[in-house]
Structures are given as structure tokens and as C-alpha cells.
Amino acid sequence: KNSEHFFHNETTDSDAEVIGFYIGAKDVEDTGYKYCGPVTKEDLQRERSGFNDGILVHIDDIEPEKMDEGDGWSITDFRLPISKKNGSSTTVFNAKFMPGAIHKKHMHTNCEEIYYIVSGKGIAGAGGEKTYIKAGHFHYIPKSVEHWLYNTSETEPIHAVGLYIGSGSVEETGYVYLGDVTGEDLII
């Protein structure tokens, strides 16, 4: 908040994808966003020693969490780059669901969840609704709403990045396992 910042893609031959979230803002105006001008050559050449405020981590430096498959977790690689472990009251997760994986029915009684599908395809359910999902989909799940995810691919994992808003850990989300995803659930 109140910190001038920018992102610059240094490559000339590939696109960069930036996924960001403004937590607690109802719209862009509510974030306090202010355009400060284009990124200049001087901005790019300025010496940097790191962030004075905030957290910057690389996903490869984060150990995968050990989630209990008996509680509906069939995620092969689940990492929490931002959480109460590094001082945040909201958790950011990075998850990979391998081909055929199902994140079984569950809910979070203490938080809302938002996730973005970076790659892969499958079926997602929330409340009484279900839909096909693929890269580019965002999914918002209010607190205490049953939801699940199924990777329908035989070859490609689903890669999702998301937030547990206002919960600094999975435990703080109020995670409740609700049971298996059935064949009936998968019919759209």
C-alpha cells in the first residue's frame, strides 16, 4: 500500500503473465491505484538490493506441504509461498493436480477462496453448480460453500494459483472434508 512499483518483462521474444490480487478492495478505484507514468530506462538501471517492505519468494524455494489424502487432498504438489510462516494473514497457494487427480468435496468455514487456472483442464464444482475449466478461468468460492476439482486429462496436470483470504494457513481456513466426488457429480 502506498508503494510505487512496476513490472518489466526483460525478454523480447516471450510474453509474461502476471497474476495479482487486491485483497479487500471492491474495485480498482478502492485499491488506491495511481498511474505514476511509464517505466523509464533509469527505473530499469536503478540499483536494487531487494524489497524494503513485502515478501518476495520463488516457488522453487518453497517446500511442498504434506497434505492428508484421507482428508480429500490428492494434490501432488501443494506449496504455500505466502502464509503466516512469513507474516501474511492471507495464504497464497500454488497447486498441481496430476492427471486424474481429484481434490474431493470440502469447504472452508473461515475464509473465501479464489483460484486461477494457469494450465490444464478439468471439472470444478461449487455449491450445486459444476463446469468445465481450463487455463484462464478464475473461480471465487464464498466461505462455507462445498467445492471440488477434478483433472480430466490423461497427460497434463492442472496448475492453479490462489488465495485463502484472511487465513494465514490451511488450518485457519476451517477446512472441512465432505466426501468423495461421485460419478454423478462429473456429469455436466
PLM segments and residue spans:
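Hydrophobic, ordered structural segments
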Residues: 1, 6, 16-40
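A short hydrophobic beta-strand segment most commonly corresponding to one strand
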Residues: 13-30, 140, 155-174
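Short acidic-glycine-tyrosine-enriched beta hairpin
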Residues: 1-2, 128-144
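A short beta-strand-loop-beta hairpin characteristic of the jelly-roll/cupin
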Residues: 108-135, 174
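Short beta-strand His + acidic residue motifs that chelate non-heme Fe in jelly-roll/DSBH
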Residues: 4-12, 104-106, 124-125, 141, ...
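Conserved short histidine dyad/triad with adjacent acidic residue
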Residues: 74-80, 93-108, 143
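A short, N-terminal "cap"/entry segment at the start of jelly-roll beta-barrel domains
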Residues: 29-90, 174-188
